[in-house]
Each structure stands twice: as C-alpha cells, then as structure tokens.
C-alpha cells in the first residue's frame, strides 16, 4: 500500500480565506472571528466582536464556514487550527485560512492531524512572509504538500488520534471547572464574606522578608 503526495488544494475541495475588510463592531448581531480567537479545541467567542447582519451576509457570501471545515490562523500567532464540527455555523471569519472539504469528515480529520505534524509546521515556518508582522500567504497553504496513504491506513491512524484528542478536551474541561471553583471559593472567602476578624496588615507581620546583600 503506497503513499502519494498531493498539494493541499488538490486534497481539499477549496482553500480560501476570510474577509480582509474591517466590519464596524456592533452591540449585537453575528460574531466575527480572527486568528486570536482560535484556542485549539474551541473558539473564544466571548472576546470576538459583533458585526451587523448585512456585513455578516457579505462575508459569508465569499467565504462561509461549514461543518468539517478547518480554520487556520494566518497572521500573528500563525498555525493555530480549529476543526468545525458544528452543523450550524453562525460566525464569519477575517484574515483566516479556511480548508474546505464539502462535508467529507474523513478527509477533514486527516488534514487536521497533518497540520499538527512537525512536517506541516516546518513547511509553514519556511513559507512565512512579512518583515514587520509575519503572515502565511494563501498560496503557501494551497501549495502545501500533503501525504496521502490509502483510505484504510488513514482511517486506522485517525482512529488512534481521535480518542487522544477527545481525552485532551475532557481534561481541559475538568481543569477549567476546577479553576472556576477555586475562583468562586476565593471570592466567597475573601471578597463577598464579611469577617470582623479580618484585617489589613503589612506583609512583614506574616512573612520573614530578607534582602540580598552584595558580598
């Protein structure tokens, strides 16, 4: 069973990018996602701007994100990726690469894991452009060589990697929950609770503080 190598734009249905315009932020509407909002296994919608419905429709008419598309950060922190598994996508993208697969889940997962590989990361590093702010050109993404084994081999590799990915997501969720509990406990004990025995004091009353001296 031999492997072949094809360009990314031959493996994917389409490789495009989000809008290059700067829609005016709104108080409500639809979310506009940029590279900084990609957090690996999730998108940080809380810090993303709202844009108007008219601007949203304008953006998605050119580069709508669909289920099993891969988002790729092209500017700033380059190489962050996110695989969209939601069948109902209601956000737009700006300055971001979009690998499209026309709903082909198997191909999407193969490309997703390849983009995480040392080989793909090395290719990206050698094809960056820009002196003041580095960026990955769209042409570089399209020309990226992608190793493609037979489908049975791809399926076997994905079957190994996906459970590991799912475990990472689960552990991250547990860590986030523990952090929220710790923050809630801190607020309850030190901010929200009135305590007559609590007082403000100097650090030296509770700690031994020494200053280093020059020999």
Predicted regions and their residues:
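Non-catalytic DNA-recognition/assembly elements of restriction-modification systems
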Residues: 1-18, 143-214
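Residues that recognize and position ribonucleotide moieties
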Residues: 1-4, 31, 89-90, 113, ...
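A short glycine-rich beta-alpha junction/loop motif
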Residues: 2, 74, 89-97, 129-158
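Sequence-specific dsDNA recognition surfaces
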Residues: 5-24, 36-67, 204-215
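A generic structural signal for short beta-strands and their flanking turns/coil linkers
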Residues: 29, 47, 93-95
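A short beta-sheet element
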Residues: 34-35, 53-116
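Short, positively charged
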Residues: 108-140
């Amino acid at each position: 069973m031999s492997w072949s190598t094809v360009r990314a734009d031959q493996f994917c249905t389409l490789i495009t990018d989000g809008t290059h315009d700067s829609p005016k932020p709104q108080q409500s509407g639809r979310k506009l996602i940029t590279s900084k909002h990609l957090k690996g296994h999730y998108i940080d919608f809380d810090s993303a701007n709202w844009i108007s419905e008219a601007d949203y429709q304008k953006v998605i008419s050119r580069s709508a994100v669909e289920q099993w598309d891969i988002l790729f950060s092209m500017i700033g922190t380059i190489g962050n990726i996110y695989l969209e598994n939601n069948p109902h996508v209601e956000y737009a993208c700006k300055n971001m690469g979009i690998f499209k697969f026309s709903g082909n889940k198997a191909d999407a997962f193969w490309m997703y894991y390849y983009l995480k590989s040392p080989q793909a990361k090395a290719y990206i590093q050698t094809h960056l452009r820009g002196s003041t702010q580095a960026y990955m050109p769209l042409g570089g993404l399209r020309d990226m060589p992608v190793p493609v084994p037979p489908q049975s081999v791809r399926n076997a590799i994905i079957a190994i990697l996906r459970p590991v990915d799912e475990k990472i997501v689960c552990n991250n969720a547990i860590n986030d929950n523990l952090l929220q509990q710790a923050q809630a406990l801190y607020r309850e004990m030190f901010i929200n609770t009135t305590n007559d025995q609590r007082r403000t004091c100097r650090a030296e009353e509770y700690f031994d503080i020494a200053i280093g001296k020059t020999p």
